UniProtKB/Swiss-Prot annotation:
CDD domains: cytochrome_b_C, Cytochrome_b_N. Heme b b566 binds at H97, H196. It is a multi-pass membrane protein. This is Cytochrome b. Component of the ubiquinol-cytochrome c reductase complex (complex III or cytochrome b-c1 complex) that is part of the mitochondrial respiratory chain. The b-c1 complex mediates electron transfer from ubiquinol to cytochrome c. Contributes to the generation of a proton gradient across the mitochondrial membrane that is then used for ATP synthesis. SUPFAM superfamilies: a domain/subunit of cytochrome bc1 complex (Ubiquinol-cytochrome c reductase), Transmembrane di-heme cytochromes. A ubiquinone binds at H201. GO terms for cellular component: mitochondrial inner membrane; respiratory chain complex III. The gene is MT-CYB. Its cofactor is heme b. It comes from Genetta thierryi (Thierry's genet). Binds 2 heme b groups non-covalently. The chain crosses the membrane at residues 33-53, 77-98, 113-133, 178-198, 226-246, 288-308, 320-340, 347-367. Pfam families: Cytochrom_B_C, Cytochrome_B. One of its GO terms (molecular function) is ubiquinol-cytochrome-c reductase activity.
Amino acid sequence: MTNIRKSHPLVKIINESFIDLPAPSNISAWWNFGSLLGVCLIIQILTGLFLAMHYTSDTTTAFSSVTHICRDVNYGWIIRYMHANGASMFFICLFMHVGRGVYYGSYTFTETWNIGILLMFTVMATAFMGYVLPWGQMSFWGATVITNLLSAIPYIGTNLVEWIWGGFSVDKATLTRFFAFHFILPFIISALAAVHLLFLHETGSNNPSGVMSNSDKIPFHPYYTIKDILGLLLLILVLMLLVLFSPDLLGDPDNYIPANPLNTPPHIKPEWYFLFAYAILRSIPNKLGGVLALVLSILVLAIIPLLHTSKQRSMMFRPMSQCLFWLLVADLLTLTWIGGQPVEHPFITIGQLASILYFSIFLILMPASGIIENRLLKW
């Protein structure tokens, strides 16, 4: 009798994806982030579901319903903070995952990579809409500022913004639709993640050396299931340290003030994981130019496969490209810092220089270093 694991139509899919999957024998801890993102998504869907049971998407009661969750619902505070900090963990894993892809040349799997970019946009949209739901000051003004950016689109801009708002300003209709979208998008993300995996399993995983690993494969279970569980334990440890010791560390104190359309906060800024893109947006004095730069800050990832000039796939043996990669990481940290600063003299210039450097690394310096390294190989 055949093993049910290999014969049952449904169990067979799980078996081929997580148990008998042939995996390269040398993939490092940087390959853990895919499974960690899956865990983050599950945590977010579960905690979000329980929050949605008590939340009301009405401008008059939204803020108090979140307060009610924290004060009166059994373990409501831990569910709420796991959801808020879970989003931060999600983005940390996402940035690490994308960074790994750039460093080791995983972007040469173009279908997987492009679905990944689509996933990133969807996750960012979901997080933005989730930030609006508590209806604090930063929720309201963040929603106003970010949705207003669409008015920069020529001809249809103003109509588009009012259509998204459901009126002439961010109000009850906006909050209700944002809640609806925030609820449905994680399930769309789950479907996209399944497609992401489907495309990945067509080619098999990349590995740190960037060479074909067909001659040396090991089964996913038990080797990488155990390895992923270690990563999972560390993720949960960090998440629970955040939730139980400093739940508001990554949040904005302004969001504990109920939304007031008549009072603008001194510094309107998004959550920390959007600050790098926000800094790029602000560094361009033109509204439409800023919006384009904002979109391109993520969309530039789609151009990387076309600009891969090196004969080697991975950066493992390419010191020049490695230096550029870590310069990019430092640049992103600088942009994140600038995004949280007021629009004043030194910060404006630093932001503009960091933005120029960001695009230069992707579009000019990395392809150039690939060509130079090819020449050095012949030398």
